[in-house]
Curated annotation (Swiss-Prot):
Location (main, coarse): membrane
Name of the encoding gene: atpD
GO biological process terms on file: proton motive force-driven plasma membrane ATP synthesis
Natural source organism: Methanosarcina acetivorans (strain ATCC 35395 / DSM 2834 / JCM 12185 / C2A)
Protein name as it appears in the record: A-type ATP synthase subunit D
InterPro entries reported for this sequence: V_ATPase_D (IPR002699)
Entry GO MF terms: ATP binding; proton-transporting ATP synthase activity, rotational mechanism; proton-transporting ATPase activity, rotational mechanism
Key words of the record: ATP synthesis, Cell membrane, Hydrogen ion transport, Ion transport, Membrane, Transport
Gene3D superfamilies hit by this protein: 1.10.287.3240
Localization: Cell membrane
Membrane topology term: Peripheral membrane protein
Keyword Transit peptide: no
Length: 209
């Protein structure tokens, strides 16, 4: 707010006081929101780290199982078995609210299947195929869990950055400028008051003479 564009009036001073009070209140609320979002972010971060560790372990396990199954049965047989699946997992997307931020909720059905629902015949396959299917079903579950948590973290982090910018703008620009303008108006009003007092004294002095 440019001070030269402000009229040094009492009504303007009152308006500025209201703006300062409102800005300080908004600043306080935004700081609370920022701190709350940061707390939520770190809660989810710990969970995401655990899920990521589990995902890495599931990936290594599934790779080991498919390599073993391929060594025993041949890669062509393993791929042919995989293509016999008649039903595929379904993903459901919804959202929920964390301190005003809509984050994803990812649920799934049909990831884990009993042996008889996998599509391939029990006869003609062996336990290596079954263990590979188990490992990959677990891997898909971990991928879904990691996707939900990591997307949530990204959205929270984006909102934290936006809120921090607004907090800083109020704290270091808006509020200081409002306070400086308020002081300027007070100074000008005091100057005008002194000038008026001085003029009145001169008028009274002339009247006495």
């Amino acid at each position: 707010m440019a001070q030269q564009d402000v009229k040094p009036t009492r009504s303007e001073l009152i308006n500025l006081k209201k703006k300062i009070k409102l800005s300080e209140s908004g600043h306080k609320l935004l700081k609370m929101k920022r701190d709350g979002l940061i707390l939520e972010f770190f809660k989810i971060l710990n969970e995401a780290r655990n899920v990521r560790t589990e995902l890495d372990a599931a990936y290594e396990k599934s790779t080991e199982k498919i390599n073993l199954a391929s060594a025993v049965n041949g890669m062509v047989a393993v791929k042919s078995t995989a293509f016999t699946a008649k039903e595929y997992p379904e993903i459901q997307l919804s959202g929920h609210n964390i301190m005003g931020v809509v984050v994803p909720k990812i649920s799934s059905t049909g990831v884990r299947k009993p042996l008889y629902e996998r599509g391939y015949g029990i006869i003609g396959t062996n336990s290596y195929i079954d263990e590979t299917a188990d490992a990959y079903e677990e891997l898909v579950e971990k991928i879904i869990a990691a996707a939900e948590l990591e997307t949530t973290m990204k959205r929270l982090l984006d909102e934290i950055e936006k809120t921090k910018r607004r907090v800083n703008a109020l704290e270091f620009k808006v509020i200081p400028e409002l306070i400086a303008t308020m002081k300027y108006i007070r100074f000008m009003l005091e100057e005008m008051e002194r000038e008026n007092t001085f003029r009145l004294k001169r008028v009274k002095a002339r009247m006495k003479n």
